[in-house]
Structures are given as C-alpha cells and as structure tokens.
C-alpha cells in the first residue's frame, strides 16, 4: 500500500484541505494516509474528521494515526510538512513582544525580520530530525514543505540533507487573481510570468491576447491609491519599483526598510499597515476552532471540494505522469541568473513521474533582484546560524535584515537577540 505521511496533522483544517483533496483524487485510491502530531488530542480530531470524509468519498483509503514518528514515516512515498514549532504560545508571542520593548514592530513575523529569524532557528533543527528519520525509514520520499519560513527551511533541507524537497506556498497561485479582482479587471485568459523568492516573487509579465496589461494595471492602481484599501504597500512598491509582488501588503510591510518606522508613524495609517496582525489571526483562529470543532470533527455528513492547494496535484502528477505546473521553491541552480546560487528561489516547476523540474527564469530586472538580495542575505545567514549554532551568526542575520537594521542600532540588535534566546529557552538548541 502506497503511503502519504502528514507531519503536523493536528492542523485539522489544513489536513482537511490537503488530504481531503487526496481523497478526491482517483490516482491515490488505495493509499494509506499516515497522521503524526505531537498533540494527541488534535491528532485524534484530525483522524476522526478524515475518517468521516473517507467513508463518504473514498473507502479504499486507510487513515492511521501514529505516536511514533518513525513508524509514521516508514515506507512513505510522500511526506507533507505543516508543523509550527513553539506554536502561538509561547513562541509567537515572544517573537512579537520582546522586539516591541526595543521599539521594533512587526506584522506577521514568519519569513524574515527578527521573528522570522527565530522561527527558523526553532524549526530547522526539528526538520533535520525529521530528515534523519526519513533517511532511515523512507529515503526516496518527497518532502512537501508548507511550513514558514519557506526559504530558510527549504534551503536547509536541500543543502544539508539528502531528502528530495519542494517548498509550497499560496502566494503565487492567487497573485494575479487577487490583483485583478481588486482593480475590477477580468482575469480569464491572461498569461503571466512570475519569479523571485518566496513572499517576494514578482509578476514579471501579464498579458491577454498578446497585449501587455501592466499599463492598465498601473493606471488603475494609481487611482485606487487615492483611497484607503488593504493592499496599499504592494501598490506603493509597484509604483516605485515597477512590478507587483506576489505576497500580501501586510507581509511586505516588514520585508523592507520603508514602511514600519518610528520616525514616520503616519505611514501605518496612510498605508493601512496592520501591526501585530499575526497574533490577532492566531487568537481568532483559536476562537473559531472552538466554535467549529464539533461540526468538523464529528460530522458524518462533512463535505469537501478540491481546494487550491498544490499538494494533491503534485502527488497525482508523480503517480500518473500527467504533468502539473505550479510555483515552487527550489535551490537556485542557475534558474535566476542574478540571484545567489545558495538562495531558494520561487519559479515555475513541472511535476511528473516521480520528479519535479524547475524552469529557467533568467535575469530579473536589476531593482527586483536587489530587493530580493536584501532578504536572501538574512536567509542565508539564518541557515548558517542554525547549522553552526553560533550566536554571532544570529546577530549578523539580524543586523542584515532590512527592517531590523533600519530601526535599531547594532548594540540593541544584539541585546534583543540575547533576550529572545533567553525567552525561547528549550525551544532552541544551545547557541555559543
């Protein structure tokens, strides 16, 4: 029996999306879905939910939960990763509250920035442990990573383990649809070309019937900027740098040195920047889960429609050899010629029989590559820190971060990092 293992299966809604999609995929009939999570209650809830979907849609699939990660991984062909090390409490709270003491504010803190750095430092060692188990139990399996920070985690796996890894994110697949909806434009029939890095890839070309749509996009965007809306940071970046970025304004507000600034507090209101957005989302998600738990977990009539997630389609392509094209995160093996070779880039990829082939993207416009490099610098130093476990490398990663370095002195950055080390405690390995 072929096997898909889901690590972090206690994320019940996400497990429903990804594994629910797999249940609706004929090519995956007869598979085992192996569930693993460190929270036994959430694991049981996900199993009950998936069993209800299985009974309704695909009785040929076996749903099994494991409290032993190695057994969950044994003979798996595919491993889906959706873990969050340290969770909302204590780790996310720490990532936001300690920087606030230094006057450093954040919105999401899951990619770069000081929060993204420490999320990477917590998570990379756990992924290395998973990789070690995979090398023993399922060395030929594909590792589909959905966990952020995408670039650092995927890069660490690709550079320091033998596991075949692809990083998957939602931003590319919704980029132009959301843009066109916001501007009141028709999305059907467009052709697009996107490349860059995760959460900072660029809509390089967008055409319909051979006509470049960027002039009309920019005209409408400039008009829309005259009133407040939720995507003002991205439109500002497009106005100044010429291209639209894939990830949301709340994310990009903290990837650059321009937007969250103590000396320009008016920018928060002018550009509708939602400070502390991610902690608010966490609280709301927890509250919503309490309300919907019973209807999701114990509902014998639970339904599912195939979602926009890439996971099931990639696995289907590998099983059937029917190609599937998607935006994936891979090592930059000459794919984007003016970005570093150690960087993880987000480019068009094609999945087919047991492999994923990334597509050549060429040279980015120089201003876009320059913006990408500012984040890549921090990403590469963060991986270096996680591998060497040297505090000095952590300090350097933080000092290279665009937002952190624009707001704090070197002395304060080092002090803040030391406070974060102390607060995270055993969620981090020992650094020297």
From Swiss-Prot:
Q: Is-annotated flag, keyword NADP?
A: no
Amino-acid positions noted as binding Mn(2+) in the UniProt annotation, renumbered to this chain? 169, 199
PROSITE patterns in alphabetical order: GLYCOSYL_HYDROL_F4 (PS01324)
Cofactor details (free text)? Binds 1 Mn(2+) ion per subunit. Binds 1 NAD(+) per subunit.
A single MF term (Gene Ontology) = metal ion binding
Please give an example of a GO cellular component term from this record: cytosol
Concerning what turns on (or off) its expression, the entry says: Repressed by the transcriptional regulator MelR. Induced by melibiose and raffinose.
Which keywords accompany this UniProt record? Carbohydrate metabolism, Cytoplasm, Glycosidase, Hydrolase, Manganese, Metal-binding, NAD
Q: What is its EC number?
A: 3.2.1.22
Q: Which reaction does it catalyse?
A: Hydrolysis of terminal, non-reducing alpha-D-galactose residues in alpha-D-galactosides, including galactose oligosaccharides, galactomannans and galactolipids
InterPro entries recorded = GH4_Enzyme_sf, GlycHydrolase_4_CS, Glyco_hydro_4, Glyco_hydro_4_C, Lactate_DH/Glyco_Ohase_4_C, NAD(P)-bd_dom_sf
Residues at the catalytic site: 170
State any GO BP term from the record.
Answer: carbohydrate metabolic process
Q: Where in the cell is it found?
A: Cytoplasm
Required co-factor(s) are: Mn(2+); NAD(+)
**What is the recorded function of this protein according to its Swiss-Prot or TrEMBL entry?**
Catalyzes the hydrolysis of melibiose and alpha-galactosides of the raffinose family of oligosaccharides (RFOs) such as raffinose and stachyose. Cannot act on polymeric substrates such as locust bean gum.
Its assembly, as annotated, is: Homodimer.
Spell out the family assignment given in the record's similarity comment.
Belongs to the glycosyl hydrolase 4 family.
This protein is called what? Alpha-galactosidase
Instruction: Give the organism the record lists.
Output: Bacillus subtilis (strain 168)
